[in-house]
Amino acid sequence: MQYFSNVALNNSQIKTTKGAEEVYYNGNRYLIGEDGVNTFLENRSEVSKTNEVHKLLVLTGICKVLEAHNLTECDNVQIAVNCPLSVYKTVGEQDNVKEFYKNGGKAYEIKMNDNEYTFTITRVVPYFESIGPVILERKKFKDDEVITLDLGSLNTGYATFDALRPVGALSNNFNDGIEGLITTVEEILLKNDISNLTTANIQKVIKGTYKHVDSTTMTEVNAACINHVQQLRHKLFNRKLNLNLPILICGGGAELLERHLKETFDDVTIMANPLFANSDAGLQLMK
């Protein structure tokens, strides 16, 4: 049995039903989405979208779409795959992503929760992570400048757009993300004799919505969150971004740090559905 955690699943923007998905693929058995299990940590540090974890999550997501429509086969599956900008800009990487998921034109055969699915991926559209917010708000910023931030688990993407065109010199990503803050907060909790919290509960602590933490500990947690956001601002400033521009923010970190982001940046908008802003934009790119 091989396991992939709920954290990895959510970061790939695929929702599960209650519990885990049992998947058989290429002679292996996987349990995807089991709460509290986070093995394969080496893959959690890999931002490329051409690895086993990402492929399994994408294939599982396709099976779930087929399941929702009472289908078991499809010979024309089209997907959009969002990548960190540094990966997206690497010569040849977009072609690698396309080839990786198209599987040489061969059909995928997968068993999920006792149901067998067969499908062929015919079209793959790579796009970079921080483009999502500006696609969703393109009418508002079609003649203006705007910055987008994607606060992900493993990396933080940023981009400046002028009349919807990305400014290459002011667009890239940092190879760190919200997972580092989660680790810091967990250490603070352990130091204060608060243990055995799930990742979901630690995220609630960061948001300030978890009830069972004392005020002294919360003061330390808030200080860590403020420092994390201030460090982000400092990095963006050092990369010459004009922080007086409107800023659109998506990603899991946007949801967790909303109050601190609004206190730190002058003109910031948290996307209405920050976890899935890039997915929503990807669907629009596919049309």
Question: What feature does the model see in each segment?
Answer:
Residues 154-155, 175:
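Short, catalytically relevant binding-site loops at active-site mouths
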